[in-house]
Structures are given as C-alpha cells and as structure tokens.
C-alpha cells in the first residue's frame, strides 16, 4: 500500500506512542522526518532521536519524554498542511501556537524551521504541523 502522507503517519505514530506512554518508537526514515524529529528534540518535546541506516531509507528511533511524575511533554500534535489542502504562510503571517507555548513547524526555502526561527529569518513557507 502506498502511503499518501508520510508526515501525518509520523505525527500519528508519535501521538499514539505518547498516549500509551511508550518509551520509544521506530519508524521509516526520510529527510523531512529527520528534520522534524531534530526540531522536536531541540525544542524539548522528545528526549532523543537516533538514525539507523540500512539498504533502504533507514529507520528513525524516537525516544519520548515524560515529566517527573509521568505527565506527557507533548500534549498535542496536529497536521496542518495536507496533500489535499496545502497551507502556506508569508513571513509576516507565520502562526503562533498557543501564544508561544507550542511551536509551528514550517517548511521553508531555508529548510524545516520552527515558527520562531522562520519569523527571525523573515521567511515563509508551508505550515506542516503544530506541536504543543
């Protein structure tokens, strides 16, 4: 079966593993998934990420992060731009998520960035997802 939206699959796997409090998950790798995983790690939403290379694209191993009492660090993930309805934002219109408590992941000409980085570099692009 052909996957029509690998980014939505990536976010759904993280959301599902987070809901049942798994420590880690493995999923097929791609360049954009690696960039999104690095953003989630840099912003403190996941503990760590590893890349396992093989003959194909490889595998990404994501280590989820929980608070001291077991509360989830990621409370929500939402795919915004979808294959059937792409959502773009100008550099002046890049959205803020929950007044800055969450992040928007934006695919720009300078790579995949958070909303804060896109505003700082004054670039717009495709709004991939919200994470809070």
UniProtKB/Swiss-Prot annotation:
Biological processes annotated in GO: translation
SUPFAM superfamilies from the UniProt entry: Ribosomal protein S8
Keywords: Ribonucleoprotein, Ribosomal protein, RNA-binding, rRNA-binding
MF (Gene Ontology): rRNA binding; structural constituent of ribosome
InterPro entries in alphabetical order: Ribosomal_uS8, Ribosomal_uS8_CS, Ribosomal_uS8_sf
Disulfide bonds: none
UniProt KW RNA-binding keyword: yes
Keyword rRNA-binding: yes
GO-annotated cellular components: ribonucleoprotein complex; ribosome
Family according to the record: Belongs to the universal ribosomal protein uS8 family.
Function summary: One of the primary rRNA binding proteins, it binds directly to 16S rRNA central domain where it helps coordinate assembly of the platform of the 30S subunit.
Subunit structure as annotated in this protein's UniProt entry: Part of the 30S ribosomal subunit. Contacts proteins S5 and S12.
Name assigned to this protein: Small ribosomal subunit protein uS8
Protein species of origin: Listeria welshimeri serovar 6b (strain ATCC 35897 / DSM 20650 / CCUG 15529 / CIP 8149 / NCTC 11857 / SLCC 5334 / V8)
Lineage: Bacteria, Bacillati, Bacillota, Bacilli, Bacillales
Gene that encodes it: rpsH
